[in-house]
Amino acid sequence: MTLTTAEWASFRALIDEPVDHKELECQAYLIHAAGLLLPGDPSSIVAATEERNFFGRTDFIIAADILDDTNQNSRHAYIFELKAPQCHLFETVTANRCQPTRDFIAAENQLLHYYDEAVGNARFRQRMNIVDQDNIHIGGVIIGTLGRLLRGGGNLPAARTALRVREKYFYPNRKLRVLTWDRISDYVRP
């Protein structure tokens, strides 16, 4: 699924919007990034947005048939929490340490709750055509841009360290990924 140059320019304009939050408008472009968001060589790709659950609304779910190492297809779903490209990931605490912004922490928290709900929900598995609950995965958080990594600029190496530490200690077990909207934009650029 390839974007035209005009479609990509419209997407990029949403990301570059300086003030208004454009999360919902950007959401529609994520299906074009399936190759980035899903592992392997996915087929029969479908997406669901704003999927209602006990805790709220799951922003983005992408499901696909994925070929495994024994050459068998099985259906998998990946759950993503979105925050606007206009959100920052980190803010400065001290000269050498950053902490996640309220938006970033909220995204992680929502993602964990939505994932936990989906794994235990037989109706969700039925709607997504998932047989095994182990085939429901945390996809990740899509938030901000590289330019909005750190609120107010400043010590960018400290912000990168803060993200690296989270990726090293918090995320590996469930393979949670943190992507920026400009990463998505670069991937879908025609």
Placement of each model-derived feature along the sequence:
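Charged, terminal alpha-helix-loop-beta segments
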Residues: 1-190
